[in-house]
Amino acid sequence: MAFRNSKIVLILLQIVAFWSVWRWYFLRLSTSNDETYGILAIVAIIALCFKKRAETSAVSNVNFIIVTTLIYAVSFPFLPPLLRTVVAVTSLTFAISGWFFGKKFHFGIWSLFLLSLPIVASLQFYLGFPMRILIGEATAILLKLNGLVVFREGVCLHFGEQSVWIDAPCSGVKMLWTGMFLASILVTIYNFSLRKIILSFVCAFGIILTGNIFRATGLFYLEAELIKMPSFGHEAIGVSAFILTCVGIVAVILKIRNFDKSESTNQLNSGFQISNFQIKIFVINCIIAFIVPVFAVGNQSAKVNQAIGNFPTIFEGKQLQELGLSEREQFFLNDFPGEIKRFTDGNREIIIRFVTTATRKLHSASDCFSAIGYSIKPLPLKIDESNKNWACFTAKKGEESLNVCERIYTENSESWTDVSAWYWSALSNENKDYWAVTVAETAE
């Protein structure tokens, strides 16, 4: 039967069956500039597949494909979109591993699929603050070894009367993605065994962490004005750390490649064979996986309990005038467990969000601006006349250029400059009134 030997049909059927997750995937790509990194991982998978196709005998993983496709269909109504997509790409990994790489499961391809998912914003939200704490502590130790009296408080390094903010790029989330992307490509090209893949990823993570520690250390000297550099000094330090990190990852993986070259990579050469019964079961599972999302969509709009806040009428001594919600606020209003209001004080636009519990729905202002097409550039930490800390950035779109600052606070003077730090604190402090204030004004 022609279908039996047509492996590409199997993969195409899977792709069609998983239509719902692709719809979610491309929606996320269209609403965040950061998530477009995932396209690089997809391109890498396609290129690696066609490179290996001519070198490797295909094997059939159809039983694993059938099981994972069924798991996708059964779990679809209960899993959030990201986890559904993980199940879908796991099933695709089984198919691609068997056809293109002659293996039951290629963890290098799977890691590239995972990196292709829209996870950068989520990684920044959940891991950004812990990684900044870790990097800040290590940076403080290095600076002390160099004779400087420095201590870390939150995500700031204090030196005398100066406070140097460990900014979001220093958390290394984007460098973590890039480093793991590079490592995934290399372990796939060299067809590493599982043991070598794990070793490569562990070493890559350590190198990425080290690179970010040295980046934060260099930026401390610059921000604390202990050294003088041109205006592009900040970018130069970041680019240098990035290049050295990538070189380190390549060097280590090449070294790992030479370990025990006789080690088996578990490549199989049993041929690609599928029985008529397996074909029928596979097609039935694909049909079920295709249909389930149609019936599940209507059950996913659970009602969100929205907290109601007593919004201020005066901000920094100026009377506030309420405005209608703009495109930025409307985009993130769905399922937001609180209130959002937009004001002006005559010169600036002020967005105030109110929640009473830790939630992933409280996005950073930079994510909101990025989602509707603004390019974002971080600015140094701002300390206002009331000694309050603000995280700031510039947002540009066409001819429009804005300076935007944000902070989150409670009535008892607790405050945070980014949502990741706030989230981890709010997890253990439920049922408080949290106010997220974003101030945007035209850049001079």
Language model segments and positions:
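Hydrophobic N-terminal alpha-helices or hydrophobic patches in metabolic proteins across all domains
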Residues: 1-444
